[in-house]
Structures are given as C-alpha cells and as structure tokens.
C-alpha cells in the first residue's frame, strides 16, 4: 500500500513534474586587452618600459626629417631656422656644433665645452693639413647619439634597403650598430658641413632651445605699492 500510494502521488497530474534545470553555460570570456603601445624618442614603450626592437620583430626606424644635401631644409614652419642653420654651417660650424650639442644634452656650460674644443681642432687642422680633418673626428659621435635617441635610419641601413643586399648584417643589431657608427664617421669626414646642418635641422624640429626655459613658468614678484596714511575725519 505504501509503495502504491507513493507511486500514485508521483503520477498525480496535480503535482507538477520536476523539470530539470538547464545546465548553466559559462559565457565566453572576452580576451584580455593588450597593453597599449606608446613611443618615447622613437622607441616603443609597453607599460612604461622601453623594449628592444627584437621584442616586436624589428621596429621600423624613422627617416631623417631632411636629406643630407637639403641645404635649405624643407618649405615648412622651420624655413627660417633652416636658413640660419645653413649659414652657421657655412660660416661658423663651431657655433652650429655647440648649438646641436646644447639641444641634445642640455646643461650648464654644454655649449662652451663643445664649441671651444671644436674651434681648436678646426684651427689646428686647417693650419697643419690645410683642411678641417680633426674636428669631424670630434663631432661624429653627436650624429650617432641623435640617430640612437630618435631611432633614425642610418646610412648603412638605408644603403642595404635600396640595394637589397647585406640583409644579414642589418639583422645583427650589434654588428649593424658598429657599421652605422663607421658610416657616421665617414659622413662627417666626406660631407662635414652638410652633416652638421642635417643634425641641426633634425634637432630644431624635435627639441626646443634650452634658453626657452623648457616650458617652465616664471613668477615675477611685484614690488609693494606705496602706502600713504590719510588723516581721519
């Protein structure tokens, strides 16, 4: 009886049949957002840390803003500055070199510490050998520093890209850098005034002059106004 009653209750139409709950399907998870890539001085930065070119499979290097033979630069907002750079490179390369170093490594006495040795080597080379053969040896590391800081394409890499040869040398970062440094030296010896002018045009488009106070605000203290004591009524 008990078993029959239980079976009758289970089969009664008044008791709703138990419905199996549908299996809960976990919604697909959205892919984690990739870290934003930013660029600092021409080198990609992930999560605030600069990474090497190998981490991204080779970072394409930028071209110089103007060619080495573009004496008057480009017809843009820096046109007057390009003319000034051309005149300095022709008449007073020591001043142009000192200005380039001052923009590249701003600091007290940077201009004098670079301009004066360059002037001495310039005069010594012209006096002993009849041409400026000593100052390029002194100034070519600046070109290497500009190229590395702003991730610019070097002369050797540009040559291999145009000719399609020596690709293995470009892939080897250390060997490529040695070859680029040698090309920087050769560029200064063969086209020294043009190399200085190209570096000057590049730096003036990227770095403001240190004399502009680098954008810091200047507070001027005004003297107090004269105060007079009046006689009360």
UniProtKB/Swiss-Prot annotation:
Expressed in roots, coleoptiles, leaves, stalks, apical meristems, immature ears, embryos, endosperm, pericarp, silks, tassel spikelets and pollen. Highest expression in the pericarp and stalks. The chain crosses the membrane at residues 85-101, 115-138. Keywords: Membrane, Transmembrane, Transmembrane helix. GO terms for cellular component: membrane. It is a multi-pass membrane protein. It is found in: Membrane. NCBIfam families: A_thal_Cys_rich. Belongs to the cornifelin family. This is Cell number regulator 8. It comes from Zea mays. The lineage of its organism: Eukaryota, Viridiplantae, Streptophyta, Embryophyta, Tracheophyta.
């Amino acid at each position: 009886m008990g078993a029959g009653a239980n079976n009758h209750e289970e089969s009664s139409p008044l008791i709703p049949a138990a419905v199996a709950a549908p299996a809960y399907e976990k919604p697909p998870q959205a892919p984690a957002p990739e870290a934003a890539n930013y660029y600092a001085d021409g080198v990609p930065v992930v999560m605030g840390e600069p990474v090497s070119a190998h981490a991204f499979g080779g970072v394409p290097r930028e071209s110089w803003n103007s060619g080495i033979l573009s004496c008057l630069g480009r017809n843009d907002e820096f046109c007057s500055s390009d003319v000034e750079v051309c005149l300095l490179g022709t008449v007073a390369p020591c001043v142009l070199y000192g200005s380039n170093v001052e923009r590249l490594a701003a600091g007290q006495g940077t201009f004098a510490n670079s301009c004066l040795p360059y002037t001495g080597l310039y005069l010594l080379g012209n006096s002993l050998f009849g041409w400026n053969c000593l100052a390029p040896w002194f100034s070519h590391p600046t070109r290497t520093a500009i190229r590395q800081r702003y991730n610019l394409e070097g002369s050797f890499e540009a040559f291999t890209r145009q000719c399609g040869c020596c690709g293995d040398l470009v892939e080897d970062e250390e060997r490529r850098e040695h070859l680029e440094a040698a090309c920087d030296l050769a560029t200064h010896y063969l086209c020294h005034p043009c190399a200085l002018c190209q570096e000057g045009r590049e730096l003036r488009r990227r770095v403001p002059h240190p004399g502009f106070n680098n954008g810091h605000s200047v507070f001027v203290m005004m003297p107090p106004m004269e105060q007079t004591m009046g006689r009360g009524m």
